[in-house]
Regions:
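A short, glycine/small-residue-rich beta-strand->loop->alpha-helix junction that serves as a flexible
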Residues: 15-27, 213-216
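Donor-nucleotide binding loops and adjacent catalytic segments primarily
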Residues: 30, 188-272, 282, 304, ...
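Leloir-type glycosyltransferase catalytic cores
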Residues: 84-88, 315-358
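A nucleotide-sugar donor-handling region in carbohydrate enzymes
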Residues: 131, 136-213, 237-241
Length: 358
């Protein structure tokens, strides 16, 4: 079915600034909006906004209030640090709500796609919430946090889940509910990557992401560990700065960050990937059919859950940040790695939500 698109509707795309994952998985959506004659406006804050400004220099961008998401120095205190920051987060969400209301009028916005930004919503225009976490893992408070999240999702016109609703899926309990009370659309895994047949240049690709201070802790640890790696290494620190830097030390080539095109090329040129087990990274690796090793962010239950799930399925091994040594990479040989998936998203059907006449 092909939709007759109304002339150039404006869609606000607003990813959460929590590491780079939410921003990067919005890239294929923003491109699809442009290809389907919509006008996207990007709204976020911090490194997520910086990354999307580099990716789409000609698209209008707006800065939203920061949620003040900080990681505890010790992973065990992660949940309590979040609880301590809750008042700041709630204030930011309320400010965001007010701001979105005025942005809709000022920019003539016709629809919303919010990737986990809880204040980006309007009852007056079609509003989509995108998340892979219908259940929010927080240890012994998982039931409570999941119910709160589902309550928020319920008010949106539709909820897009970047996974399949098949028996074989990537998110497991994170992205699947036992009840059918939310207006869910499983859109399939989202990735900006394409698999290419290119000669292998690197034996190991290290790619870091995620909020501070845990990104820095892992960065420092792995810079020491890769000195003992026998082979060529490319090391992407995941620090988005004004200009890209490249430094070669021994067998390791360091970059502060890469844009999508460079990342795609480097992924394809690398034999093995060492990274966090964030869901956006999982989708990219699955799209490319890569072999990988995971180090979940300490205290982030979602990443720990995904790492355990994928190891149990004999796809990807993992180690904790404290325990990891470079010798652990030898375990990868006995794991299957990701089978490459092809996901042809039906953008016509997805974007029809913005075309429904009231």
């Amino acid at each position: 079915m092909s939709i007759e698109y109304s002339a150039n509707k404006t869609i606000l795309v607003a990813p959460l600034n929590w590491g780079l994952g939410h921003a990067t998985r919005c890239i294929p959506i923003i491109k699809a909006l442009q290809e389907n004659k919509y006008i996207p406006i990007i709204a976020s804050d911090g490194v997520a906004l910086a990354l999307l400004r580099k990716e789409f220099p000609y698209i209008e961008t707006l800065e939203l209030p920061s949620y003040h998401i900080e990681y505890a120095k010790n992973g065990k205190n992660f949940k309590w640090k979040l609880i301590k920051n809750l008042p700041k987060m709630i204030t930011a969400i309320l400010d965001e709500k007010k701001m979105v209301k005025s942005l809709i009028k000022k920019h003539g916005i016709d629809g919303i796609i919010s990737d986990n930004r809880l204040g980006v919503f309007s009852r007056k225009i079609p509003s989509v919430f995108m998340t892979h976490q219908l259940n929010v893992m927080t240890g012994n408070t998982t039931w409570f946090t999941s119910k709160c999240h589902q309550h928020i999702i319920k008010k949106y016109t539709e909820c897009w889940v970047p996974d399949t609703n098949e028996a074989v899926n990537l998110t497991g309990d994170l992205g699947h509910l036992k009840t059918d009370e939310l207006n869910l659309k499983y859109i399939g895994p989202l990735s900006r990557m394409r698999k290419k047949d290119t000669p292998k240049v690197y034996d190991l690709m290290v790619i870091l992401s995620g909020p501070e201070p845990q990104r820095t802790y892992l960065d420092e640890k792995l810079q020491e560990e890769v000195k003992r790696f026998d082979g060529k290494v490319v090391f992407v620190k995941g620090v988005v700065e004004k200009t890209q830097t490249k430094e070669e030390i021994g067998n390791v080539t360091y970059y502060n960050f890469m844009n999508s095109k460079q990342l795609e090329q480097t992924f394809n040129e690398s034999e093995l990937v060492l990274c966090r087990s964030g869901y956006t990274t999982v989708m990219d690796l699955a799209k490319l059919g890569k072999k990988a090793f995971f180090i979940p962010t300490p205290g982030q239950y979602e990443q720990e859950y995904l790492a355990i799930k994928l190891q149990d399925e004999n796809l990807v091994p993992y180690a904790t940040q404290n325990d990891f040594t470079i010798e652990d990479l030898s375990k990868v040989k006995s794991f299957k790695g990701f089978a490459q998936f092809k996901n042809n998203i039906d953008w016509d059907s997805l974007f029809s939500i913005f075309e429904d006449k009231a």
